[in-house]
Amino acid sequence: MQSARMTPSVGRQLLRLGARSSRSAALQGQPRPTSAQRLYASEATQAVLEKPETLSSDASTREKPARAESKSFAVGMFKGQLTTDQVFPYPSVLNEGQTQFLKELVGPVARFFEEVNDPAKNDSLEKVEEDTLQGLKELGAFGLQVPSELGGLGLSNTQYARLAEIVGMHDLGVSVTLGAHQSIGFKGILLYGTKAQKEKYLPRVASGQALAAFCLTEPSSGSDVASIRSSAVPSPCGKYYTLNGSKIWISNGGLADIFTVFAKTPIKDAATGAVKEKITAFVVERSFGGVTHGLPEKKMGIKASNTSEVYFDGVKVPAENVLGEVGDGFKVAVNILNNGRFGMAATLAGTMKAIIAKAVDHATNRTQFGDKIHNFGVIQEKLARMAILQYVTESMAYMLSANMDQGFKDFQIEAAISKIFGSEAAWKVTDECIQIMGGMGFMKEPGVERVLRDIRIFRIFEGTNDILRLFVALQGCMDKGKELTGLGNALKNPLGNVGLLIGEASKQLRRRTGIGSGLSLSGIVHPELSRSGELAVQALEQFATVVEAKLMKHKKGIVNEQFLLQRLADGAIDLYAMVVVLSRASRSLSEGYPTAQHEKMLCDSWCIEAATRIRENMASLQSNPQQQELFRNFRSISKAMVENGGLVTSNPLRV
């Protein structure tokens, strides 16, 4: 499970990461996406990078079709815009029939994991028991979003998220097995499959008769997908391709019968006659012959899931098994990987829910110094912070699933944020649970140490969080950069763009005089949350001011300012989280939910601290010379360590 390798040009490459994720929001031939929980084959580590897309001054002079204004809150916040279409009010997307169907599923699935599945045994055996797999098949768990007419349950993204949450509460090893199968294993068939491909393969995978796996990562390719070496050469007759190569760290690799495989294919340019290699996606069956696998990998966590190397030796793949178009494999891979990021947040929200229950139980029953430890301030703060992190993660997960079900097309930044936030929140919550439980938490019997081992991979799955932070910042800056390019073009023709220039001048004047942007969430958030709403608006203004200043300073060079980009991404994550919880808590207050006042406290607490972080971080980036000194020190210290082969300092005893 390799971490992404960072190269000097990674910033420019990242401008493509996720650019197509939103366009896969609806599955072909069925209602909206199957963004099945991303539970999550190791090969997703790659964050899938494409050839660089640069911000070219020439590009701004070419005629381009008008693009609809994005409804994404995340896109808007980089521009200093308060775009509320996708975040307010907190969406309710299930109709009565869907809600009833979900209720009928939740009970049996929860009981199965409580009464039948044994996560400790799965971990010890390093596999999911056959009886458990059979039970999951009977529940329909292998085809949750496959259309019902093809043997699946045909769930929406929101319905899927709820079941992903239940699985995450109980066993992340099983989650990975299920997710590697349907979230990425056969997801490409759902997104890009022809009618014939769907009819041939989906009934088999939906029933669990055949497991699926996603084969992308190779020893030479981590984040740089273009460096894969597996090849698929078309036969002279054009009826098949001969596939050769190997893939590493493939979840379900030793169990699967159907594989989504990515390989380079030679493609002749019709105009020039030149032959270039481009990535193409294929549906490959083990029964084709020439498909073998290695021994299961020994891993830190998610031991119950099968992870192995897969080899393809002269495999004859029928031409009709090309997935999507020849040469479009990168697009297929990006959409598969990006399509289900929200599912990780839903899964880990469930994991946190279960872990928090263990922490609360221990704090409630443990007596020290003559009192229950839940009465001690240190423990109270830990529990409260754990609850806040779970609330934010869960709110993001269901916001995103609803956005997808509603048919919104632009949510890739939000999806990346949910993955980053959820995976880091789950790690913190589990770590704090162990701390609250003390020595008992470190023991094997309570099962928290297993969850900690399992959770560590989620900061690597789906693209490492480091890579995704760069994507969040660069994608947002790219959208803002286009706006600034438009302003520059307007200055070339001031008489024809009076309105645009007056608006920009007015905005700059308000910022300089401290008047503010005039943005407000008044009338949008519940009145009881007005103070937190004001904090969110102020944070947005501070964030957007720094984004614009840094873009003006660095221009295209911002792609190489990774210290800066990381901190902008952290601000974006905090800000999106503020708005999401404001939306959810507002709905709870408006509807009079029994938990409304508790949710208000969770929301206010998050907003107070997030606003403080944004204010301090943005002020530091904007005007603190010590920040630049710190960045220079990081570069120099790191360089010295690399040159020295490790630490530069010696033991203080000099012995």
Curated annotation (Swiss-Prot):
Instruction: Name the GO cellular-component terms.
Output: mitochondrial inner membrane; mitochondrial membrane; mitochondrial nucleoid; mitochondrion
- Which Gene3D superfamilies does its entry note? Acyl-CoA dehydrogenase/oxidase, N-terminal domain, Butyryl-CoA Dehydrogenase, subunit A, domain 2, Butyryl-CoA Dehydrogenase, subunit A, domain 3
Under which main EC class is this enzyme filed? oxidoreductase
Describe the processing and modification events after translation.
Answer: S-nitrosylation at Cys-237 in liver improves catalytic efficiency.
- Segments carrying the region annotation (Membrane-anchoring) are 483-516
| Chain spans, region Disordered | 1-70
- InterPro entries recorded for this chain? ACAD9/ACADV-like_C (IPR049448), Acyl-CoA_DH_CS (IPR006089), Acyl-CoA_Oxase/DH_mid-dom (IPR006091), Acyl-CoA_Oxase/DH_mid-dom_sf (IPR046373), AcylCo_DH-like_C (IPR036250), AcylCo_DH/oxidase_C (IPR009075), AcylCoA_DH/ox_N (IPR013786), AcylCoA_DH/ox_N_sf (IPR037069)
How does the record say this protein sits in the membrane?
Peripheral membrane protein
Active-site residue numbers:
462
Q: Which residues bind substrate?
A: 461-463
Q: In which tissues is it expressed?
A: Widely expressed (at protein level).
Residue ranges with Polar residues bias: 21-37
Q: Which residues carry this modification: Phosphoserine?
A: 517, 522
Q: Kindly list the positions at which S-nitrosocysteine occurs in this protein.
A: 237
Residues the record lists as N6-succinyllysine modifications: 71, 127, 195, 239, 268, 276, 278, 331, 372, 482, 556, 639
Alphabetically, the GO molecular function entries are: acyl-CoA dehydrogenase activity; fatty-acyl-CoA binding; flavin adenine dinucleotide binding; identical protein binding; long-chain fatty acyl-CoA dehydrogenase activity; very-long-chain fatty acyl-CoA dehydrogenase activity
Enzyme Commission code(s) on record? 1.3.8.9
Per its Swiss-Prot or TrEMBL entry, what cofactor is needed? FAD
Compositional bias of kind Basic and acidic residues: 60-70
Location within or outside the cell: Mitochondrion inner membrane
Modified residue annotations for N6-acetyllysine: 51, 71, 127, 239, 276, 278, 298, 316, 331, 482, 550, 556
> According to its UniProt record, which protein family does this protein belong to?
Belongs to the acyl-CoA dehydrogenase family.
**Subunit record text:** Homodimer. Homodimerizes after import into the mitochondrion.
What does the protein in this record do? Very long-chain specific acyl-CoA dehydrogenase is one of the acyl-CoA dehydrogenases that catalyze the first step of mitochondrial fatty acid beta-oxidation, an aerobic process breaking down fatty acids into acetyl-CoA and allowing the production of energy from fats.
- Which protein, by its recorded name, is this? Very long-chain specific acyl-CoA dehydrogenase, mitochondrial
Q: Which organism is it from?
A: Rattus norvegicus (Rat)
